[in-house]
Amino acid sequence: AVKSGAKFNKDMILAQMKEFYTQCELYEMTGCVHTAKLFVSEDKFYIGEDIAQHNTIDKAVGKAVLDGANLANSFLMVSGRLSSEMVVKAVMHGIPALISRTAPTSLGVVIARKFELTLCGFARGENINVYSGEERIYE
């Protein structure tokens, strides 16, 4: 299970999601890649871009690990759907929350609940759907 006392403000998450899409440089140039952003603190984040969505997490987390970042209070934003594989990657790295502007798969939700990962989808505008780990999100 993901053990973390991290709490995340809903408005801060939505602001970071909005900013996230301004930081997807390769997507802006090509229109055909996925992006992941690992948010560690207001001034520390790591971006991973790749044509394969799963690789974006590996790239962002790899940069953070090489930099010695503590992931216990971080959250991960991804550009695509929240599949079971994406959820497993977040759990394996001890990242407490995984967020996307799109939907989770049903198996992704089951795994997130089993391993106490906060899973949020449709994070856009002023809305966010929390599918598991509601206790980490506050107004």
Question: Which positions does each model-derived feature cover?
Answer:
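Short beta->alpha transition motifs characteristic of CBS
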Residues: 49-51
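Feature captures the catalytic cores and cofactor-binding loops of soluble hydro-lyases/lyases
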Residues: 53-131, 136-139
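Intrinsically disordered, low-complexity regions enriched in acidic/Ser/Thr/Pro/Gln residues
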Residues: 1-41, 46-47
